[in-house]
Each structure stands twice: as C-alpha cells, then as structure tokens.
Amino acid sequence: MPVSFYDEIELEDMSYDDEKDVFHYPCPCGDRFEITRQQLKDAEDVARCPSCSLIIRVVFDPIDFEDGDEDEAPVNTIDVASQAVAAAA
C-alpha cells in the first residue's frame, strides 16, 4: 500500500531545536511535525506529527548526515533557540 504524505518539505525550511536535536515544521492541526538528527542519519525521511496522523516527507541530502558531522547543524536551517531569544528581545 503506498504511503500518502501530506506534503514534501525541504530540510532547509524546517526549524532546528539544538537542545532536543530535533527538526520541526508546523502541522495544520496546530502541533509540529518532528524528525530527529539520528533519523536523518539513518536515511529516514518521514517526519510525523505527534498529535495527528499526518506525515510529511523531508527532502534532504544524506551526505550532510554522514559520520563526522554529528556536532554541526545543517546549513540554512532555522535555529529555534535563536528565534526565542530574538523574540524575547
């Protein structure tokens, strides 16, 4: 049975939470789709919403997650912690 994705989203369009090591993207239900850095390293490309049944396909370059890049966030992602600091200022 084919998988039905709500959408396909570029990794660069997702927010990154450095503390939790998780990428997020807004879900229409009000929660957020989530995928971890480890899932991406394992070539997993499905981000799930914990509050509903929707899933998205994350478009990314697996080479960015090869061994040796564990301490670096992919370039061009939005750092959620930085957004919170900027919003509070």
UniProtKB/Swiss-Prot annotation:
Positions of Fe cation binding: C27, C29, C49, C52
Pathway: Protein modification; peptidyl-diphthamide biosynthesis
Annotated GO biological process: protein histidyl modification to diphthamide; tRNA wobble base 5-methoxycarbonylmethyl-2-thiouridinylation
CC cofactor: Fe(2+)
Limits of the DPH-type MB domain: 5-61
The keyword Iron is annotated on this UniProt entry: yes
Location in or out of the cell: Cytoplasm; Nucleus
Catalytic activity, reaction form: [3Fe-4S](1+)-[protein] + Fe(2+)-[Dph3] = [3Fe-4S](0)-[protein] + Fe(3+)-[Dph3]; 2 [3Fe-4S](0)-[protein] + 2 Fe(2+)-[Dph3] + NADH = 2 [4Fe-4S](1+)-[protein] + 2 [Dph3] + NAD(+) + H(+)
SUPFAM superfamilies the record matches: CSL zinc finger (SSF144217)
Pfam families: Zn_ribbon_CSL
A cellular-component GO term for this protein: nucleus
GO MF, any single term: oxidoreductase activity
InterPro entries, alphabetized: DPH3/4-like (IPR044248), DPH_MB_dom (IPR007872), DPH_MB_sf (IPR036671)
Keywords of the record: Cytoplasm, Iron, Metal-binding, Nucleus, Oxidoreductase
Record has Lyase as a keyword: no
PROSITE patterns: DPH_MB
Family: Belongs to the DPH3 family.
Function: Required for the first step of diphthamide biosynthesis, a post-translational modification of histidine which occurs in elongation factor 2. DPH1 and DPH2 transfer a 3-amino-3-carboxypropyl (ACP) group from S-adenosyl-L-methionine (SAM) to a histidine residue, the reaction is assisted by a reduction system comprising KTI11/DPH3 and a NADH-dependent reductase, predominantly CBR1. Acts as an electron donor to reduce the Fe-S cluster in DPH1-DPH2 keeping the [4Fe-4S] clusters in the active and reduced state.
Subunit structure: Component of the 2-(3-amino-3-carboxypropyl)histidine synthase complex composed of DPH1, DPH2, DPH3 and a NADH-dependent reductase, predominantly CBR1.
Domain observations: The DPH-type metal-binding (MB) domain can also bind zinc. However, iron is the physiological binding partner as zinc binding impairs the protein electron donor function.
Name used for this protein in its record: Diphthamide biosynthesis protein 3
Organism: Mycosarcoma maydis
